Amino acid sequence: MSHPGNLRAITAMLAACAMFSCMDALLKALAGTYPPFQVTALRGLSAMPLVCIYVLWRRELGVVFSRHLRWRLHLLRGVITVLMLALFTFGLKTLGLAEAYTLTFVAPLIITMLSVPILKEIVPPRHWVAIAVGMGGVVVALRPDQSAFLSVGAVAVLVAAVCYALSNVVGRVISRTEPSATLVFWTTASMALGGSLLSAAQWVDILPAHWPLLVGLAVTGFLGQLAIVEAFRHSQASAVAPFEYSALAWAVALDWVFWRAVPDVYTLAGGAIIIASGIYLIRREAPRAMVVVAP
């Protein structure tokens, strides 16, 4: 018998993927005009007002600024997140959304690998086989015998996936003692402050035509965050996490609608292998807690 909250949770996850895909499309649109660290800053600055309102509405301001917060871990996660988003934005300048998503889907495999040295978890041999198969999918997607996809942008997105995995693992450590509100607030603040400092010397004035994009960036990111929290609140991670891969369908659609780009067979085949490996790991790791805060 299915969990009573599964349908609601799956619907929330699908909505979250739609919101985050639209947000990434906006990041790609901005990446052609502004430096990567500035786009990171704009992502954080645009979302900060909504995050503050949400924290106040939830009456969690005291929790967010508690003296018992694990500040070093929050700082580490903030640095990793800023680097991750800047690299991902840099990659989007030359890659389509579907190509970028195919590479970032390797993150669950990396998270499983990192859980051994950092979280002291035991990974069964069959999981290592799934990881190896998933990495084979990356090779297929990159098709290293050609230069079309094995580019600086692709490498940047792969490094961004590693950063995302690190951020997720650090977030799992923090979430053992702190609520999700602290992760949401300080991750957003890190993007706003860190991105602003690193882009100050190269800051480009915001074009009037791009202000609606920034509003869209804030709204889609915020709604996506609420939806993904709702998804994991009403069901087990193993039931809803596989639906995160529905983002690839949105990426293909957005690529076509806005850039008339279609992923080739290598990207789709590699993506299918990576997704299959990721779903296997997610389904097998049902008891493990998952972090639901996405930048």
Where are the language model's segments positioned?
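Transmembrane alpha-helical segments that form core, pore/gating elements
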Residues: 28, 36-37, 51, 146-206, ...
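Transmembrane alpha-helices of multi-pass small-molecule transport proteins
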Residues: 34-83, 163-167, 186-201
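Hydrophobic/small/kink-forming positions within alpha-helical transmembrane segments
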Residues: 17-22, 52, 78-86, 108-113, ...
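Structural signature of hydrophobic alpha-helical transmembrane segments
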Residues: 36-49, 90-107, 150-163, 207-221, ...
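C-terminal transmembrane-helix exit sites in multi-pass transporters
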Residues: 88-90, 107-129, 249-268
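Loop-to-transmembrane-helix transition segments
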Residues: 8-16, 62-87, 152-160, 205-223
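Helix-helix packing/entry segments at the starts of transmembrane helices
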Residues: 101-106, 174-189, 225-256
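Hydrophobic transmembrane alpha-helices of multi-pass small-molecule transport proteins
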Residues: 126-143, 266-285
